[in-house]
């Protein structure tokens, strides 16, 4: 017999991989005491109840029912509700084994999403005394989360319902079922469930599935917004769960992405939960939790909501020292680990961003452990830089300006084009500068041009400008631009495009630089950008006109418009390009010849444009029916647009500064009007004298006037 392979190595490697370790320079912390030991010791308290297997006949029926609900091809709401009722009748008494089955758990989740309030209560009743087991289960925990969200909506409805709604609900109960459970308020059922979880709270914190249930319970008790279960930045589900829900097409209903009213008893339950959890923690274990991949988000949430029920902020002071205390060597080592660890930095960033911690707590940590090395932390592109970004919007104005003074002169060095590092830092610096009254704005602009367009002359841009600006930011070479395999734009491309759009919104100099880069591109490459799902937005955002535009910029605008010649019809018939053609209507203000040229190009292939869904929208937005049939009215639209650009509408109170040629024309018109008035007065005087001479009344009047003067 050959030598047998020793067992348990994979598990040992995995535990070592997941085990958080402090750096060697972290003093006074026991590096041997890892959270893995706590995890292994707590697993003994995890309930593991077996609810039975679903047989093949039942499985086929429930799979078909799940598919029917997924397609949702019911003719009416009543038909769908009838189908749900029949499935619930078939599932009665089998709910627990269905939610623990991979396939049937999807059906139960759909049933809960579509169920009415009475049906929800029935399902809730079936789960009683088994909530803990379901929370620790891989599939059942997802069903339980959906049930909790809908239960929160039902609790709010019971709190706010009118007498008429109560009467209607009572009638529905009598018609559907005589079960006494429907007479019990949902609030009482929910509190009963909360009591089931209390002995297991410390075990739930670091469990892969139960921790998500615990976070949702805390959000409901605190009356916070319950996030979506499918959006990428949701705190409700894990990343894998959100991807899976998209693949199986389970969508949230209107109960997600909102907060609910909660009864006063929930505050007491939240206080009890916080006290129960904190009783099982000390400073060492709490700090270990804060750098634990699963436990850290739970601790972040507890710090965020503890202020609702605990003035002393026990969780915060369990991890960090009191605000009256000075620098501590153990705390300093812990903060240093947070600033250099991926999980720890996310924990610190989250508690700074959220409104749970008091500003003086954050200010203490900043002054003691971060202020003297702001620039060094900003160079940690995967950890410390996110802390600095969060601090920019939480500290006092003086401290924010200090951070800006440290980072702005080195901004060009901090940004890495190749590694796509610190683009977010540039974004946050711009926002912080704007919030401080455009603090050091010109320096930020110069630093960004030094980094992304070092050869570009900001004051005197020339015609031989290269494409380095958009190439360095968008990384067009190697992107999905021009691919014929229908590749989806990557998240990286989307992030870069949004950054360029941000720069163009920040200062018009970036718009001018982008125009020169567009003109330096081969026309085919530029057209590919217009057809790209992400880069088309960059083109669209660049087509803006500055108020009181100088003549040189207007000439540059004409040159940019020449690129679109012979491309209008193709763009108009494309889902992305059609938005660009729509934008050209405003971009061609004061350039009626270019408007006419674009409209003529659309008219030349009107049949093709009108056959396209997007082309028809462009045809309408450009007022092409007026262009074809009533050219004078179309010209009136252009004139109206020019008046709006100059601010000469009837409702406008401010007048623009007039150009010299306009002032000269006004002077000439005023002089001509004055001369006409003088000529008219002279003519009227001559006519009057002739009339007086003819009637003989003039001399008498003169005598009378002379007598008065005497």
Curated annotation (Swiss-Prot):
Its main location: nucleus. Pumilio repeats lie at residues 90-125, 126-161, 196-232, 280-321, 329-367, 369-405, 520-557, 562-600. Residues 652-680 have a biased composition (Basic and acidic residues). It comes from the Eukaryota. InterPro entries: ARM-like (IPR011989), ARM-type_fold (IPR016024), NOP9 (IPR040000), Pumilio_RNA-bd_rpt (IPR001313). Keywords: Nucleus, Repeat, Ribosome biogenesis, rRNA processing. GO terms for biological process: endonucleolytic cleavage in 5'-ETS of tricistronic rRNA transcript (SSU-rRNA, 5.8S rRNA, LSU-rRNA); endonucleolytic cleavage in ITS1 to separate SSU-rRNA from 5.8S rRNA and LSU-rRNA from tricistronic rRNA transcript (SSU-rRNA, 5.8S rRNA, LSU-rRNA); endonucleolytic cleavage to generate mature 5'-end of SSU-rRNA from (SSU-rRNA, 5.8S rRNA, LSU-rRNA); ribosomal small subunit export from nucleus. GO terms for cellular component: 90S preribosome; nucleolus; preribosome, small subunit precursor. The keyword ATP-binding does not apply. Residues 1-43, 648-710 are annotated as: Disordered. One of its GO terms (molecular function) is RNA binding. The keyword Transferase does not apply. RNA-binding nucleolar protein required for pre-rRNA processing. Involved in production of 18S rRNA and assembly of small ribosomal subunit. PANTHER family: NUCLEOLAR PROTEIN 9. Belongs to the NOP9 family. This is Nucleolar protein 9.
